[in-house]
């Protein structure tokens, strides 16, 4: 490949299996996962990827048991309040959360909104998808395309992903 992909999707997967196989708690597994996501984001930024979308929590995942959700939320809040601010320059990086904020804990949403307000740089964009549903995105893109009188492919908020890392 002569150039880096413009947009990379990250799907953290296997953290529950890793916890079981290694005798670790879910909380520890999800925290390690958030640290690994941060490492990958930094590598993508160094390699001149323009946008990275982290598929954090689908709407379907919200049906998981409370102990699993609490571990995901805690690691996500750590990612938002500690890892992202410590590793990414707000003057060069931007952040945006996509999904149904009404379905997420207030602390999670507040942490994401704080990053959205402060991280507005032009060089590297981080999208976080939480309480996200692809069908909702399709419906929203369809409505935007009709309102803006444009092709539906130009109306997606996330944009086309060139490569997925799972």
Please annotate each region the language model reported:
Residues 1-166:
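Flexible, compositionally biased loop and terminal segments
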